[in-house]
Each structure stands twice: as structure tokens, then as C-alpha cells.
UniProtKB/Swiss-Prot annotation:
A biological-process GO annotation: 'de novo' IMP biosynthetic process
Organism of this sequence: Psychromonas ingrahamii (strain DSM 17664 / CCUG 51855 / 37)
Chemical reaction(s) catalysed: 5-amino-1-(5-phospho-D-ribosyl)imidazole-4-carboxylate + L-aspartate + ATP = (2S)-2-[5-amino-1-(5-phospho-beta-D-ribosyl)imidazole-4-carboxamido]succinate + ADP + phosphate + 2 H(+)
GO molecular function: ATP binding; phosphoribosylaminoimidazolesuccinocarboxamide synthase activity
Protein name: Phosphoribosylaminoimidazole-succinocarboxamide synthase
Classification of source organism: Bacteria, Pseudomonadati, Pseudomonadota, Gammaproteobacteria, Alteromonadales
Assigned EC number: 6.3.2.6
Gene name, Swiss-Prot/TrEMBL: purC
InterPro entries linked: SAICAR_synt/ADE2_N, SAICAR_synthase_Vibrio-typ
């Protein structure tokens, strides 16, 4: 079996029993379970949720997305070996730590396989909750052009690229396209201020205005927990994106939880601390892949200019990258995951077959 065969590139074709269409994202696919299967699993497994809570199977792939496109390599390699397992392992680690430290729960109820979560359906807060500890990336590019206000926060003059910010900044953006909100453009991923959120809290799916402060508290506390733990293994937590949502517990009480993924190389920038002290930036995140792409193609503006999205899509579809590029990313993801969780990650030889067998034999979910 070749390495390409071990990559789970297509994750929306599993024979999981469902009456709804599979929701396929850039990396994950979600299978909504039937009401009867949800109720059965809640009773059989003792999940701490309401008896009628909707459940889903969330399957992560090894696909890699950057600049809003999915990339592939030569030799039929349509993903990064070990990427999905690494991302899930990291998120599992941080979610458990958050819960153990009394921050908040996550949407995950069960982990049948390294690539699979059983989750409780949440009502998402429509905000990409971004936290920044260093000035880099898009924030630096805007700062370099003279911008000094970010999401309603004034930034001082005199900052240098990649330096640590005077304080941890929350710079939220919209999750998807939100229409009809005064002062907020109806485009994907647009920066918003705290005032925007306060004035339109219901449009962002907050239940109360008090929950805005709670989301900010959970964001900053979660960031600090991860930053503290990464420092122990010689890594810097540069910036990240969290997502939040509401679920109901077994008693029917609504609570705000962490969801999606947290502290992964896909959702965060992570730098090597020793190299940073020497003045070098060594990425242990997807930012490394983004830089590889920018250096690989002769016209990087295609990747950065949103007005050239059609060209960018063609570029990703019609250009197989050298296999070594995806293998380098594989090594980065697996290495940082193993440092974080403290043990080796075992990769599946045939992930799709393994997932189907487990969901059939242990959960009775395969038709």
C-alpha cells in the first residue's frame, strides 16, 4: 500500500445512517444522525446531554486548505499523511485541559477513532474569535501600510514585524456572510468591533449581552492555557482562532462551549522559541505551507488577491505540488502534535475501512 493510499482525502462518502445531506467543509465532514440513533447512543453511552439532543459524526480528512483552496501533490497524494490525526489529537488534548481547568466544555462527546468525533449539535456564535500575542501576518501587513486601528483597538506606532504585542489582543471577524447588521459589511471574514457585537448581539447568535464578556474570558483564558503549555516544550503561541457555540446539558440548561478545533497548526501560528530568540521565524503551523506556496508559484499575487479567486482555484486544481512539499508539512504536523500530547501518533493503514468497522461494530451506525 502506497503512502497516498493511507491519506483520507474523501470523507463525505461513508455509509453512515443519516436522513440529512452530509455537510462537507474544507477539511471535515459532518453526518447528522437520525433522531432514533441519537437517542439510542445517548442512552447506551451515557452522554451528559439531554435525551433528545441531536448528535453527529464528524470525520476529519487529511486534505490541506490554504488561500481558500484545496491542494494536492504528485503521485495521487490528495492530502497530508497524518494531518487529520494530528489535528484531532491536538484539539482533544486542549479541550480536555480546558475542561480539567474549569474553563468550559466542548462539543465532543466521544472519540471512536483518531479521525472521528461524536459531537453534540451546537448553535454557533457567528464570530471567528481571533486572539493575537504577536504582530505578524495580515495584521502586520495592514500596520506596515499605516493602519493603527484594528477591530476598534488603537495600536501604538513604532512596532516591528513579529514582535510581541504590549497586550493580548482580541480581533474578531464574522463567521460567514452576515447580512443586515449596521456597520458590518456583508462579506465573509470581515473584522468587527466589540461595539458591533454589543449593538447586535442577537445577530451574532449570543443569547445575552453578558455572554459577550464570557466569550472574551474563555478566549483569553484558553489562549493563556495553551500558551503556557507550549512554552514548556519550547514553542510560542503567536495567534489563533477559536469558535464558540451553545448547547444544552442533560438538565436542559444552555451553556457556552468551545467548538470546532483549538490550538492546532491549522487554526494557529506556532513558532519555535529558540529560533525566535535568534531572530528567526520557524513555523510549526500551516503558515509554513502558505509560505511554501507563495515561494513556489511565480505570481504570488494570485494567492493574495481576492479578486483573482478564479485564477487561484485553477492554479490549485491544475498544479500538483512536489510530494516533498506535503511530506514536509506532514512531518511538521506530526512532530508538533507528538510534542504537545507527549506520545507517538499511530497512523491508520486504511482509515476509511477502520472507521466503518468501528462505527458499525461499536455504534451500530452503518447501513
Amino acid at each position: 500500500m502506497s503512502l497516498a493510499d493511507k491519506v483520507l482525502a474523501v470523507n463525505n462518502d461513508l455509509p453512515i445512517r443519516s436522513t440529512q445531506p452530509v455537510h462537507s467543509g474544507k477539511v471535515r465532514s459532518v453526518y447528522w444522525l437520525t433522531e432514533s440513533d441519537s437517542r439510542r447512543l445517548i442512552a447506551e453511552k451515557g452522554y451528559n446531554v439531554a435525551a433528545d439532543a441531536p448528535l453527529a459524526i464528524m470525520v476529519i480528512s487529511d486534505r490541506i486548505s490554504a488561500f481558500d483552496c484545496i491542494w494536492h501533490a504528485e503521485g495521487g497524494m490528495n492530502g497530508v499523511p497524518g494531518k487529520g490525526a494530528a489535528l484531532n489529537a491536538i484539539s482533544n488534548h486542549w479541550f480536555k485541559l480546558f475542561k480539567d481547568q474549569g474553563l468550559a466544555d466542548s462539543h465532543i462527546l466521544d472519540i471512536p477513532h483518531p479521525l472521528v468525533w461524536i459531537v453534540q449539535k451546537a448553535r454557533p456564535v457567528m464570530i471567528e474569535a481571533i486572539c493575537r500575542q504577536y504582530i505578524t501576518g495580515s495584521m502586520w501587513r495592514a500596520y506596515e501600510k499605516g493602519e493603527r486601528e484594528f477591530c476598534g483597538i488603537e495600536i501604538a506606532d513604532g512596532l516591528k514585524k513579529d514582535q510581541k504585542l504590549p497586550e493580548l489582543l482580541t480581533t474578531p471577524s464574522t463567521k460567514g456572510i452576515l447580512e443586515g447588521i449596521p456597520g458590518v459589511a456583508a462579506v465573509d471574514d470581515v473584522n468587527i468591533t466589540r461595539q458591533n457585537i454589543e449593538d447586535n448581539f442577537a445577530a451574532f447568535n449570543f443569547t445575552t449581552t453578558q455572554d459577550i464578556a464570557l466569550y472574551e474570558k474563555l478566549l483569553k483564558e484558553g489562549f493563556n492555557v495553551i500558551s503556557h503549555e507550549l512554552a514548556k516544550i519550547g514553542q510560542i503561541f503567536v495567534d489563533t482562532k477559536f469558535e464558540f457555540g451553545y448547547v444544552k446539558d442533560k438538565a436542559g440548561n444552555e451553556k457556552l462551549i468551545y467548538m470546532d478545533e483549538v490550538g492546532t497548526p491549522d487554526s494557529s501560528r506556532i513558532w519555535d522559541a529558540a529560533e525566535y530568540q535568534k531572530g528567526n521565524i520557524v513555523e510549526n503551523s500551516k503558515e509554513d505551507f502558505r509560505q511554501l506556496l507563495l515561494n513556489h508559484f511565480p505570481d504570488p499575487d494570485i494567492l493574495l488577491n481576492k479578486d483573482r479567486m478564479a485564477e487561484r482555484s485553477d492554479l490549485a486544481k491544475n498544479n500538483a505540488l512536489p510530494a516533498a512539499v506535503l511530506m514536509k508539512i506532514s512531518a511538521t504536523y506530526i512532530s508538533i502534535a507528538e510534542k504537545i500530547i507527549g506520545h507517538k501518533i499511530t497512523l491508520s493503514d486504511n482509515p476509511k475501512a477502520e472507521i466503518i468497522e468501528i462505527l458499525d461494530r461499536q455504534y451500530g451506525l452503518i447501513d
